[in-house]
Amino acid sequence: MADFKEYAKKLIEIEGGYVDHPNDAGGITMQGVTLTTFRQYCGEDKTVADLRNMSYGTWCDIMKDLYWDKCLADEIENQAVAEITVDWCVNSGTQGLRKVQEIAGTKPDGIAGPKTLAAINGANQKELFDRIMSARNQFYVNIVKKNPTQRVFMNGWMNRLGRFKFE
C-alpha cells in the first residue's frame, strides 16, 4: 500500500516556498497550500504571515487530510499511482481525481470510494500510471490553450510531472 510519508518528501521539494504570482489562479501559496485552503483548515483569522510561517507538521496535516486521505491513497496498492493521483488533486483540485476516475473506467464524481479503489487497484499499474501522466500533460497544454497567460507555469508543470516515475 502507498505511504504518505514517501510522497510528502517528494511534494515538499516540488512545491518549494512562498509564491504570489499575479497569474496564479490559486493566489498566494506556501509550499503548495493556498491562503484560502490554509484559512479553511486552520481558521479564517489566519494571515499571510501565518501561512509563511506554517510548520512542517501543519503542512503535512493539510496535505494528508485534504488530499491524500480524500483520495484514499493509503489503500492504493502502487506508490507511484497513488502519488500521481494525489498530486493531480494538490495541483488542480477535485478535477484531478475526476480525471483519474475517468481514466480508470469508473464514474468521474471526484469522490474516492470502493469503486474508485477497485478500478485503480484492478488496473495494470504501469499502464494506468502512463495514461494518467499523458492525460495530465494534455491537461496542462489545454490550460495554456484556453488561457495563454498560464504559459508562464508550463515549465514548472512539466518539471513537476518529471518528478514522478513508475516503480
Which residues are covered by each model-predicted region?
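Cell-wall polysaccharide-cleaving catalytic domain and substrate-binding groove, primarily
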Residues: M1-E167
